[in-house]
Amino acid sequence: MRTIQHLVIPGGAIYGLSYYGSLKYLCQNNAFQMHNIKTIHSTSVGSIISTILALKFEWSEMDNYFINRPWHEVFKFSLCSIVKCFKNNGFFDISTIKDIFLPLFSAKDIPIDITMKEFYEATGVELHFFTIDVSNFSLVDINYESYPEWTVVESVYASSCAPVLFQPFKKNGSWYTDGGILANCPIKQLCESKINPKLDEIISITTEDRVGDTNKTYDKYNLLQYVFDLLSKIVNKIQPTYTPDKEFSRYEVIISQSLIPVYDVFSIVNSPQQRKILIDHGAELSRDCCSKILERNIDIIDSIV
């Protein structure tokens, strides 16, 4: 019987919590087990989620971390941060990613400056983070083989530094920005890589149409919501509107982003209740995918018997 060995986790800002909720539901209902996972391909917030999953905490511990941590102390919005945004091309810098990971890394006795190669050796999970080299607007796959000496924090930040919200990542004379513009869901990159996975070894999470309702009103948008809605429309012109791609993925969870505006960071960092709603949203949308995987396993067992 084939087991799920590869996960694909996309970008999607606050909906990273829904991706986490989806994978928690699938794992707890025996669709896959983390100890069988060999690779995780991810972009933007998906890179944050994949790093945390690779640490293999108990689900109850991760629930407590995501829901009850005082996130407003990590993402601090103030007049000072607004001024810095104009000066430094973004509200937050790499120190925010360090703050996200520090308590988790410390709990596992992992140094915050651990390299990609060291992290692979410690966890056994091959992480692939996708970012964009701004100079030539090319997609870059950061992994332990291609960038072994980059730290995990640097690699995740390069993949996650969405324009305006985060400052671009600068290293070795190059600037990097959020990989979601060119590969928001890097399932194609996984399937066309040397890994050459079987279709029934992959669980892919993706999002439905990123543009959303064309009749929406902008009257109540804040700056971040306006900028990222505009970016979503640009991305949609670069990448075709999403349709399920059975050529690349047999087991897929499609996360609707209609529950809360995708870049409503302000309300999410201040509300444990809203964070739990997003996690439960992901779990609810995973039921069909879970049933497909379990039915497949039953059919295989029946055929063997």
Show where each model-derived region lies.
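Patatin-like phospholipase
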Residues: 1-43, 51-305
